[in-house]
């Protein structure tokens, strides 16, 4: 299916070791309608759809996109275009008293933009200095 251009395989990148991790890629679909047609159900995980949408938007903006790994934490996206590097976490919503999305950023190298993208307007704001942006604001 990858050769049919239905999916993008995104490599995992070890941020600390600055190397690609073999065999640990993550897949994103070119068209979410394809997944829905194959699964024949309407309730595809919203978090997956939002993450897939952010991935496609980053590609359209000319970023090279990786899935980041730092120690045992996953960073949804490391997006790089020339010298511009962004660390991005994507979530449908941030549960109360849950710091998983921001904790993944705590030990990352400084100097690069960090951002959490959410589908919940109530989450928009700032968590420990990290901007939390609504998906619509990210897309425009």
Map each language-model feature to its residues.
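Accessory nucleic acid-recognition modules appended to NTPase machines
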Residues: 1-84
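Short, glycine/charged-rich beta-strand-loop motifs at protein surfaces that mediate ligand recognition
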Residues: 43-44, 89-92
């Amino acid at each position: 299916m990858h050769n049919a251009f239905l999916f993008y395989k995104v490599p995992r990148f070890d941020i600390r070791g600055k190397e690609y991790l073999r065999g640990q890629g993550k897949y994103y679909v070119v068209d979410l309608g394809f997944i829905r047609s194959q699964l024949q159900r309407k309730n595809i995980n919203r978090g997956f759809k939002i993450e897939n949408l952010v991935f496609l938007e980053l590609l359209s903006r000319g970023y090279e996109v990786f899935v980041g790994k730092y120690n045992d934490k996953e960073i949804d996206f490391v997006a790089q275009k020339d010298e511009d590097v962004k660390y991005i976490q994507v979530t449908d919503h941030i549960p109360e008293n849950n710091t998983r999305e921001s904790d993944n950023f705590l030990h990352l190298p400084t100097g690069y933009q960090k951002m959490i993208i959410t589908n919940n307007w109530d989450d928009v704001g700032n968590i420990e200095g990290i901007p939390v942006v609504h998906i619509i604001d990210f897309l425009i």
